[in-house]
Curated annotation (Swiss-Prot):
Pfam name, any one: Ketoacyl-synt_C
Record keyword Lipid biosynthesis present: yes
Alphabetized SUPFAM superfamilies for the sequence: Thiolase-like
Catalytic residues, chain numbering: 164, 304, 342
Name by which UniProt lists this protein: 3-oxoacyl-[acyl-carrier-protein] synthase 2
GO cellular-component term (any): cytosol
Biological process per Gene Ontology, one example term: fatty acid biosynthetic process
Amino acid sequence: MSKRRVVVTGMGMLSPVGNTVESSWKALLEGQSGIVNIEHFDATNFSTRFAGLVKDFDCTEYMSKKDARKMDLFIQYGIAAGIQALDDSGLEITEENAARVGVAIGSGIGGLDLIEAGHSALVEKGPRKVSPFFVPSTIVNMVAGNLSIMRGLRGPNIAISTACTTGLHNIGHAARMIAYGDAEAMVAGGAEKASTPLGMAGFGAAKALSTRNDEPQKASRPWDKGRDGFVLGDGAGVMVLEEYEHAKARGAKIYAELVGFGMSGDAYHMTSPSEDGSGGALAMEAAMRDANITGTQVGYVNAHGTSTPAGDVAEIKGVKRALGEEGSKQVLVSSTKSMTGHLLGAAGSVEAIITVLSLVDQIVPPTINLDDPEEGLDIDLVPHTARKVDMEYAICNSFGFGGTNGSLVFKKIAE
């Protein structure tokens, strides 16, 4: 059967550099860092004392305080981004179309804040003091659940959780649901709030985080020789995906077309990528096959680019492998994690939005802090300054613990 076309008609975002898509995009193009010192708990004894935090978030713009008390912050962030995306799309939910509009929003970790609080209540005060809302306030599918309740969305309701590939996988699978007729529209993405004591301690114990405590805004430096680990970030990114003819019929504005989705597994290591980049390459190759394009047609790759010694090099090897010699010579590759940090389960969806905006505005955001590039990469990593470009296709990559990889291909919509 022939697939139906899928387009992006709405976007919403909370990130360390802005609480809307517009403010985040402006900050990224200007090369602003959203990394700050941690002040919401005492991080004195932690090896890493900074993160990419959401600032000045007011939950009452999106829900009542009563409802918010039953939700971990990752749920609140996801709902906020979802409401932004739905409002941006102009898609009206009616009794007639509700069953054809679904939600696919996940989280890599879920409600760490309230898990920690629930455990403290159990240990210090006993089982009767654990909140009756403990489970629904922390599990990963409750962004999708709560948003569907708030907006009356009765189509497919899922929450894929695949570590740092969560947001991208939810978008990719939501697109396939539309392509194969399960829905006319899907609200898709990821949300995360892992900058908690347990989250910071866990990633710190794994030696995954940068410890550049004297220069937090310079800590996330993908492909730079001085990189020493990733910077944890919080936030949410959500898209409204829609069947093309459905979007056209209602006069929706269309940002871009999602033409390719690919997945793969490294089958290599619990936390490290395959050194030759072959796992990531398989995902990119699958996405390009799905899009029916070659490597020479790709203008931009929004890289996973986390600022880890092994991962950054492996990804560039994968890009070269997937795009080929000619494609690699002309493509621009950048990592916006240099500014936002790594949003874990929200990274792929936030960066998918960034990739779409790059196509819309024909400009590539920079990789900041790339002062001394790793030798031998031989690819344009867009250091320091955003770059205007003429392109039709762009790729977004996400790779996660356990070797779970995903790539999306977006296409510019013709005027």
